Curated annotation (Swiss-Prot):
The keyword Cytoplasm applies. Monomeric heme protein which primary function is to store oxygen and facilitate its diffusion within muscle tissues. Reversibly binds oxygen through a pentacoordinated heme iron and enables its timely and efficient release as needed during periods of heightened demand. Depending on the oxidative conditions of tissues and cells, and in addition to its ability to bind oxygen, it also has a nitrite reductase activity whereby it regulates the production of bioactive nitric oxide. O2 binds at H65. It catalyses: Fe(III)-heme b-[protein] + nitric oxide + H2O = Fe(II)-heme b-[protein] + nitrite + 2 H(+); H2O2 + AH2 = A + 2 H2O. It comes from Struthio camelus. Keywords: Cytoplasm, Heme, Iron, Metal-binding, Muscle protein, Oxidoreductase, Oxygen transport, Transport. This is Myoglobin. Its EC number is 1.7.-.-, 1.11.1.-. One of its GO terms (cellular component) is sarcoplasm. Nitrite binds at H65.
Length: 154
């Protein structure tokens, strides 16, 4: 399940492009998540009033949360699988406070790959996409394990 050094390099190379416009990427990812999977919006009390793409696009709060999401994910990805210290507090809040199901982590993982592929098609070919899928799967599996430690079946 682990990634090779080459796969981690592919993940971190494309992640550098994401970080060059983290607000734009984060906003696009959350907008797409809520549009493709409207049920996920139920977990975000402060975004429930955002029912149209126009409202989502205009929301500074949504943009700000997108930065938070991708900043945290970036910290985890940069650990190349050795992310226990970064993952544990994130899993704890997502399990005990926000109660985010693992299925929603799958949804956002799919959306992350779609959005990166749209924004960076020339730099995010099949090999890079496969590496990112593996990295996000590792993240989700480790989150699911931590969820169980916190008593959340998610």
């Amino acid at each position: 399940m682990g990634l090779s050094d080459q796969e981690w390099q592919q993940v971190l190379t494309i992640w550098g492009k994401v970080e060059s416009d983290i607000a734009g990427h984060g906003h696009a990812i959350l907008m797409r998540l809520f549009q493709d999977h409207p049920e996920t919006l139920d977990r975000f009390e402060k975004f429930k009033g955002l029912t149209t793409p126009e409202q989502m696009k205009a929301s500074e709060e949504l943009k700000k949360h997108g930065v938070t999401v991708l900043t945290q994910l970036g910290k985890i990805l940069k650990q190349k699988g050795k992310h226990e210290a970064e993952l544990k507090p994130l899993a704890q809040t997502h399990a005990t406070k926000h109660k985010i199901p693992v299925k929603y982590l799958e949804f956002i993982s799919e959306v992350i790959i779609k959005v990166i592929a749209e924004k960076h098609s020339a730099d995010f070919g099949a090999d890079s996409q496969a590496a990112m899928k593996k990295a996000l799967e590792l993240f989700r599996n480790d989150m699911a394990s931590k969820y169980k430690e916190f008593g959340f079946q998610g």
